[in-house]
From Swiss-Prot:
Protein name per UniProt: Actin
UniProt keyword Cytoplasm present: yes
Enzyme class: hydrolase
UniProt-listed PROSITE patterns: ACTINS_1, ACTINS_2, ACTINS_ACT_LIKE
Species of provenance: Trypanosoma cruzi
GO cellular component, one term: cytoskeleton
């Protein structure tokens, strides 16, 4: 039996992207959007053998004639039928294996409702017939991938941002902070900013175009007020070519959009802390003796931490909050967009981890609630 035949499958189900591949692999096999698309108009899809449903890249490619839906919102599955379609696509079309022959490691944000992971567990065993499975916390897996056992992870994806302090390999649950604002909220904010300057984006397909604008052109201002002043003095516009060939000029929206990560009130979240405040609050909830080590290992993870200048701005803002003798160190691994998956690949291939899997026999005996006993 080849290694690949018995390797576990690691599937990081993000709100925006699915990352999947074999345990122990260095390189990620498959990345595709967590989208399910259905024809807006049944008659319009004659050529596709009147297919009723498209998943991932195929849905993205046909987005002009489809209505697109993300079954995961803010890290929580809101449509289990569509989620099942995404897992089916992952196993059979992307990784191309029969899940009945492979253990599966899934990921989830901390502080999710208990029934979310119970339902994940149930579907894996009952619908896909996996022999064993495990649910890992995203930020903890990111720390594994950075080669550290102590640090605070700031993980910001498409749906959820969370800070998880970990000391000597143990996460400190009482100090975890979670905010239901992340990349998708920034995309919506950018849509609003662009519409204020006269552009119109309304459909689910056009929202995907705005997401591309965000990922390609937006950056974090090191000093927001200074950037506003400078942009008023000089023309700081970047062209973006729309699918129909029209060129759109994007100006100060480029740095106004990600500013919401530090000032959530910009998008109507008046009580929510910014990235720097979340990190600071999390560290302050930890024992005084471990705080210095956490300040020295602030590890970024997830696609929404990929903005230019974000690590530097975060370091600066945390320095303003921390005791004066502390020099915060923000670690921004270049592969951080995929570090949750990489950590899952590392963890699931360790010999010491093999006793951690939830086996089918244990599930049959205890039911879906077994996931709370065996997975942190």
């Amino acid at each position: 039996m080849s290694d690949e035949e018995q390797s576990a499958i690691v599937c990081d189900n993000g709100s925006g992207m699915v990352k999947a591949g074999f345990s122990g692999d260095d390189a990620l096999c498959h990345v595709f959007p967590s989208i399910v698309g259905r024809p807006k108009n049944e008659q319009a899809m004659m050529g596709s053998a009147s297919k009723k449903l498209f998943v991932g890249d195929e849905a993205q490619a046909k987005r002009g004639v489809l209505s697109l839906k993300y079954p995961i919102e803010h890290g929580i599955v809101t449509n289990w039928d569509d989620m099942e379609k995404i897992w089916h696509h992952t196993f059979y079309n992307d990784v191309r294996v029969n899940p009945e022959s492979h253990s599966v490691l899934l990921t989830e944000a901390p502080m999710n409702p208990k029934q979310n992971r119970e339902k994940m567990t149930q579907i894996m065993f009952e619908t896909f017939g996996v022999p064993a499975m495990y649910v890992g916390i995203q930020a903890v897996l990111s720390l594994y991938s950075s080669g550290r056992t102590t640090g605070i992870v700031l993980d910001a994806g498409d749906g959820v941002t969370h800070t998880v302090p970990i000391y000597e390999g143990y996460s400190l649950p009482h100090a975890i902070r979670r905010m239901d604002m992340a990349g998708r909220d920034l995309t919506e904010y950018l849509m609003k900013l662009l519409m204020e300057s006269g552009m119109t984006f309304t459909t689910s397909a056009e929202k995907e175009i705005v997401r591309n604008v965000k990922e390609q052109l937006c950056y974090v201002a090191l000093d927001f007020d200074e950037e506003v002043t400078n942009s008023a003095k000089t023309v700081n516009e970047e062209p973006f070519e729309l699918p129909d060939g029209t060129i759109m000029q994007v100006g100060n929206q480029r740095f106004r959009c990600p500013e919401a990560l530090f000032k959530p009130m910009l998008i109507g979240l008046d009580e929510a802390p910014g990235f720097h405040e979340m990190t600071f609050q999390s560290i302050n909830k930890c024992d005084i003796d471990v705080r210095r080590d956490l300040y020295g290992n602030i590890v970024l993870s997830g696609g929404t931490t990929m903005f230019k200048n974000l690590p530097e701005r975060l370091g600066k803002e945390i320095s303003n909050l921390a005791p004066s003798s502390i020099k915060p160190k923000v670690v921004a691994p270049p592969e951080r967009k995929y570090s949750v998956w990489i950590g899952g690949s590392i963890l699931s291939s360790l010999t010491t981890f093999q006793t951690m899997w939830i086996k089918k026999s244990e599930y049959d005996e205890a039911g879906p609630s077994i996931v709370h006993n065996k997975c942190f």
